[in-house]
Amino acid sequence: MPQFGILCKTPPKVLVRQFVERFERPSGEKIALCAAELTYLCWMITHNGTAIKRATFMSYNTIISNSLSFDIVNKSLQFKYKTQKATILEASLKKLIPAWEFTIIPYYGQKHQSDITDIVSSLQLQFESSEEADKGNSHSKKMLKALLSEGESIWEITEKILNSFEYTSRFTKTKTLYQFLFLATFINCGRFSDIKNVDPKSFKLVQNKYLGVIIQCLVTETKTSVSRHIYFFSARGRIDPLVYLDEFLRNSEPVLKRVNRTGNSSSNKQEYQLLKDNLVRSYNKALKKNAPYSIFAIKNGPKSHIGRHLMTSFLSMKGLTELTNVVGNWSDKRASAVARTTYTHQITAIPDHYFALVSRYYAYDPISKEMIALKDETNPIEEWQHIEQLKGSAEGSIRYPAWNGIISQEVLDYLSSYINRRI
């Protein structure tokens, strides 16, 4: 088979002539060897002569080679190709070789293309039956169940995962980014993209009944195209989101917003985002490399989604599935495995007691369905009950110089004061 380098150096007219000559006196061997030429010609036709990269050529050539079939007697040839222009390709090849019939099957990276009626029927069945819905997510469910059956609490698992990043890199910044990302997805039951696309200029302080003051920010670019809020708040013990937010802001810089060329990008004037787009790849590798649990080493095991899986499980164990629905915006009818993998989000009022429960400054009484305060002097409500009490400090601009003028001064000052008191 002609190699990629030879094809690139072959003049187009010569390449076409060689291709046509194969069909003048066809044999099975000749036709079987035309996959590379087909790949190159099809790319030229569908991309108006644009050069093809080697990796792309190899990918497309594999698809054609594995699907190529022909009938010399009836002069017909069939193959799969990644395109939405199958009719154009067929017409172009027919023009080159009028005596032959070409059939091109659009390739979408799946075994077969389902009929739209089958797709709708399948989704309807999942909507009406939780058992059918569970089937699609059985692999992830089994792995998560294995993790939770280790006899450890959600918080012990969370702390072990946080600790595992200490051995990921010798660079403080890298470890800080991974720990911040994991904890942010955990406490917000969110996706990686939810945290990545947060608008730093949207940070603000909001009042909370149980914790006094918490930090709220906005993300408008989500996988479901529906905006949602992300929160950071004080928590008991080592798993304190504000401590990790402090470390993140001290060891990172604002990231210029990636230009989104689709959707409503023209109306989105966001200048910065919180994390780089490619962080998720190295984050997943870090989880796998220093995995505190064996399931992280599984190829398709939960990695960047582990935070939201853990929070969903925690709320479910507490018998608070209604909170899961609110935080993840899942409908009551589909609060099942499908809900846990759909994760649609919108700006929904999350009840104050969710933050109280996750902070661990409070315990939930399932009988009275009330939050019971645990005596702990580190609870910020013991000192700061209202936002007005925070005014007067100006330490944030010194502690977080990279974020001055981007994150609200009020938020930076509050976080700096909180850390000084906490330490």
Curated annotation (Swiss-Prot):
What the entry lists under InterPro entries is as follows: DNA_brk_join_enz, Integrase-like_cat_sf, Recombinase_Flp_C, Recombinase_Flp_N
Q: Is DNA-binding included in the keywords of this UniProt record? A: yes
- Effect recorded for residue 308 to G: Inactive and weakened DNA binding
**What do we know about what induces or represses this protein's expression?**
Repressed by the negative regulatory complex REP1-REP2.
Ordered alphabetically, the record's keywords are:
DNA integration, DNA recombination, DNA-binding, Plasmid
UniProt-reported outcome of changing residue 305 to L/P: Inactive and weakened DNA binding
PROSITE patterns annotated for this entry? TYR_RECOMBINASE_FLP
Domain named Tyr recombinase Flp-type: which ranges? 136-422
**Could you name the domain of life of the organism this protein comes from?**
Eukaryota
Catalytic residue list: 343 (o-(3'-phospho-dna)-tyrosine intermediate)
Say if the entry is tagged with keyword Lipoprotein: no
What is its biological role? Part of the plasmid amplification system, which corrects any decrease in copy number caused by a rare missegregation event. Catalyzes the recombination between the large inverted repetitions of the 2-micron plasmid during plasmid replication. This recombination event changes the direction of one of the two replication forks in the bidirectionally replicating molecule, effectively resulting in multiple rounds of replication from a single initiation event. Binds specifically to the FLP recognition target (FRT) site where it induces DNA to bend. Three types of bend exist.
Family under the similarity heading: Belongs to the 'phage' integrase family.
Assembly information from the UniProt record: Homotetramer.
- This one is known as Site-specific recombinase Flp
